[in-house]
A protein has these predicted regions:
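Conserved non-catalytic scaffold segment of RNase H-like nuclease domains
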Residues: 1-119, 125, 165-179
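Short alpha-helix plus adjacent loop in nuclease-associated cores
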Residues: 131-162
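Short acidic, glycine/Ser/Thr-rich loop/turn "cap" segments at secondary-structure junctions
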Residues: 94-99, 138, 155-159, 180
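Internal, conserved structured core segments that host functional sites
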Residues: 96-97, 104, 117, 130-142
């Protein structure tokens, strides 16, 4: 077994996150929920599930159905986007932390930028080079595609855009397949 693999580095820190949004528009849909874990050595150091308070939030019927969104729950739990950002961004921009998630490169990085824009912050994608997108990894495993270690981020972008009928890469499928 290759001891240099990330999974053997018990001091490596990971930020695992996901956003829920008003819809699928990569330019305008606002993230209304962000959930994240900070993990080191197999131990969860932090666990958050926070709602962002935006005026006139308009979650599409499809997004509400998929995410279980209700305005009642949202109104109970919503917090200042800046307050949530302060907690979240310290991990996102920590250069010693790898960032992990399903389809982060295809969706969530855009939602993070919308969040920043709504708070009048400049775009900052400096964290993207540290992303490990589990959708890209799932495609690579399913199709037996070797990793491009020299240009890992471009390799992941190519794979998240791979489309093939009956190729299963959802988190639910992967968790079941690998008994996680």
């Amino acid at each position: 077994m290759d001891e240099s693999l990330l999974r053997f580095d018990k001091k490596q820190k990971y930020l695992v996150f996901d956003t829920e949004t008003e819809g699928l528009n990569l330019i305008r849909s606002r993230p209304w929920q962000v959930a994240w874990l900070v993990v080191e050595g197999g131990k969860i150091l932090e666990k958050h599930d926070m709602f962002l308070d935006w005026p006139n939030l308009d979650v599409s019927a499809g997004a509400a159905k998929i995410t279980g969104f209700t305005m009642e729950e949202y109104n109970k739990r919503k917090e200042s986007p800046r307050k949530v950002w302060e907690k979240f961004s310290k991990h996102l921009y920590d250069e010693d932390t790898f960032i992990v998630g399903q389809n982060l490169l295809g969706f969530d990085v855009y939602m993070v930028n919308i969040w920043r824009e709504l708070m009048k912050l400049e775009a900052d994608y400096s964290y993207v080079e540290r992303i490990i997108d589990t959708r890209a990894l799932a495609v690579a495993i399913a199709k037996d595609i070797p990793v491009d270690k020299d240009d890992f981020i471009s390799w992941q972008y190519r794979l998240i855009n791979h489309r093939e009928r009956k190729l299963k890469t959802s988190q639910a499928f992967l968790l079941k397949k690998y008994n996680i």
